[in-house]
Amino acid sequence: MALPILLDCDPGHDDAIAIVLALASPELDVKAITSSAGNQTPEKTLRNVLRMLTLLNRTDIPVASGAVKPLMRNLIIADNVHGESGLDGPALPEPTFAPQNCTAVELMAKTLCESEEPVTIVSTGPQTNVALLLNSHPELHSKIARIVIMGGAMGLGNWTPAAEFNIYVDPEAAEIVFQSGIPVVMAGLDVTHKAQIHVEDTERFRAIGNPVSTIVAELLDFFLEYHKDEKWGFVGAPLHDPCTIAWLLKPELFTTVERWVGVETQGKYTQGMTVVDYYYLTGNKPNATVMVDVDRQGFVDLLADRLKFYA
């Protein structure tokens, strides 16, 4: 039986490719998709979810828009990374359907209530919507199998020296998620920076030759340009968000450790930092499965294989 998942995302190039991968995988049953503000404004990330589902001919999937800002802070967006639309690069179709007439939290709650088995929440943006769900519906915690997030790192940052972007946008929300008691799986920069897509991988995807693989290649063309900055020291572009889906499909591609994780919400230099107790110094019981390594070639091969689904 396919694993039921609920995807909360802020497309964003890598979020879009995570959607592509999830919907090409019969092992997963995507029950709903909710959008969060993050990589772009809430209006644009919602539109991008609708555009991607229109492209993939999956307008049957319920979609809802989430919180317009973080729990306690002003919104920060990553338009310098993802462009004015949030998905700059390819010519994507305009949406042919509308979102549900409800909030993201309402759609999440409805999805959990209606599911006959616990649902895995995959969150590839800031954790605002998930935190609001957890706070407003404690009775539904038992309906959540796990929360798989793209966010954080062990002592590494890509937005500040200490913080990864998704966690930095709403650290209070991330702290709620990590301390919820629900199993959390963390795909942080330690693993996603190893999941780099190279130029030759992009050409491999393009050569598959179907409309979706072509769009994915064009998304990566744009994404690669940003990551050419020598400050990163990258060969290609880290494909952050699809690591969450890839872990669900092929966990054997990833090396993980069980550790306690907390989120710094007040530090002068470290707001948004995920504090990973790697050496068990706090005495706290592990609350997260933390990805630390990936078989890069296996990851690329998985994506290439699933792109053929859209032929």
From Swiss-Prot:
Protein family membership: Belongs to the IUNH family. RihA subfamily.
EC number: 3.2.-.-
UniProt key word Cell cycle: no
Pfam family, one: IU_nuc_hydro
Protein name: Pyrimidine-specific ribonucleoside hydrolase RihA
GO CC annotation: cytosol
Role: Hydrolyzes with equal efficiency cytidine or uridine to ribose and cytosine or uracil, respectively.
InterPro entries in the record: I/U_nuclsd_hydro_CS, Inosine/uridine_hydrolase_dom, IUNH, Pyrim_hydro_RihA, Ribo_hydro-like
Active site residues of this protein: H240
GO molecular function: purine nucleosidase activity; uridine nucleosidase activity
Keywords: Glycosidase, Hydrolase
GO biological process assignments: nucleobase-containing small molecule interconversion; purine nucleoside catabolic process; pyrimidine nucleobase metabolic process
UniProt xrefs under SUPFAM superfamilies: Nucleoside hydrolase
